[in-house]
Design a protein with these regions (language model features):
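Conserved SAM-binding loop
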Residues: 11-12
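A short SAM/SAH-binding and catalytic strip from SAM-dependent methyltransferases
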Residues: 39-54
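Conserved SAM/SAH-binding beta-strand->alpha-helix loop
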Residues: 4-6
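Core SAM-dependent methyltransferase catalytic element
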Residues: 129-152
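A short glycine-rich, Lys/Arg-flanked "PGG" loop and its adjoining helix->strand segment in the class I
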Residues: 54-67
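C-terminal alpha-helical "lid/dimerization" subdomain adjacent to the S-adenosyl-L-methionine
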Residues: 73-131, 137
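Conserved SAM-binding strand-loop segment of SAM-dependent methyltransferases
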Residues: 18-30
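A short acidic, Gly/Pro-enriched loop at the edge of an enzyme's catalytic core
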Residues: 28-41
């Protein structure tokens, strides 16, 4: 699911070229995904751009099976501005991107939280909990990304 039609068309084309038949791609707003007992839902480097990340996560929770997992991959960030600047070499660049691209995109949408790409793991996990997930953890961390897992 993606709201960007050209991306969905490209995904369909590539899947067809590779002979993959067990995949489906749909143009859809994240808040309008049909309930279908999915085992896994993922958002890659985009949750912070969404105007209502809590509402979208809650909507995704409703699409998951009882044991389903929501995986959120976000840009690497540490908790706390000073800590992030001091210990995350990419943070200054990411704050710049966030100021010019991510936050304005979020603010232009419904709710307009303006999370930005440097929220840090604690804030991201807090928002997933607000969305109704009972089991939220930082599953992996690389120099470029945080990977969060939300279940139940």
């Amino acid at each position: 699911f993606d709201f960007h039609g050209p991306s969905i068309e490209e995904a369909k084309k590539r899947a067809n070229e590779k002979g993959l038949t067990n995949l489906e791609f749909f143009v859809s707003d994240a808040g309008e995904i049909p309930k279908n007992d999915y085992d896994l839902a993922c958002i890659f480097d985009a949750w912070h751009d969404m105007g209502d990340p809590v509402g979208i996560a809650a909507s995704i929770k409703e699409t998951l099976s009882k044991d389903g997992t929501f995986m959120v991959v976000e840009p690497m960030a540490l908790d706390g501005y000073a800590n992030n600047i001091a210990n995350n070499p990419a943070s200054a660049m990411m704050y710049g991107f966030g100021t010019l691209v991510c936050v304005p995109a979020s603010k232009a949408q419904s709710v307009g939280l303006g999370l930005g790409p440097q929220a840090g793991p604690s804030k991201l996990m807090e928002l997933l909990s607000e969305a109704g997930f009972g089991n939220v953890n930082l599953a992996a961390e690389t120099t470029n990304n945080l990977v969060l897992q939300a279940r139940g």
